[in-house]
Amino acid sequence: KVDYINYQRVHFNKEYLLLDDYLDYFLGLAENAISYIQDATAKEKKDERDELVISHRRINSNLKKIYYNVENIVLDHISRDVSEYLKYLFFNEELDYNTVANIINSLNFSRYGYRLLFGRMLFPSHFFDIYENIINNSQKELEIKKIVLKICDYESYLKFIFQEINKKTKLPIVEWLT
């Protein structure tokens, strides 16, 4: 996805100036997430808690409509659903840090699963979903401001999630986040 977006970017010309202004930040975040997940895959042992489950590709406000949509269902690690739900809470103004802490504390993941969860939280799927809609002309470019205006808050949210997971298992530090 990151490579494809870089390819598309060359063809933007001056059509998507606002999108282009923030693309480097989100591509960098995506590269961080990919590296974090690749490192977890290479260094951590999986156990029976890491089996594939039926997951949602995305969780959003239309969950009731997409719950049984086969195009929104994938086989993946359970951390996918958890990370999508945590992102949903943040971006839909339903964020309560006590609820997030309770969710994380209720998880029984392996170390690999927790690293995967945090790597997925780092990956800016929320940005790329809007990006695709803008490129496909189903959303206006100004929609990206909803994400951009929350960059600092989302970084604080990531720090909080990192700290909560670290109460259960020590994660490798993401330097720019500390």
Where are the regions that the model predicts?
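ATP/Mg2+ or Mg2+-diphosphate-binding catalytic cores
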Residues: 128-178
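Active-site acidic catalytic loop and adjacent metal/ATP-binding pocket
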Residues: 37-82
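Active-site activation/catalytic loop segments of kinase-like enzymes and analogous catalytic loops
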Residues: 78-111, 121-141, 149
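A structural signal for short hydrophobic/aromatic patches embedded in well-ordered alpha helices
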Residues: 116-118
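Short helix-capping and hinge/turn segments at secondary-structure transitions, especially at repeat
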Residues: 28-35, 39-42, 60-64, 84-94, ...
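ATP-dependent phospho-/nucleotidyl transfer catalytic cores
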Residues: 1-54, 168-175
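Generic structural signal for well-ordered, non-transmembrane alpha-helical segments
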Residues: 24-31, 122-126, 152
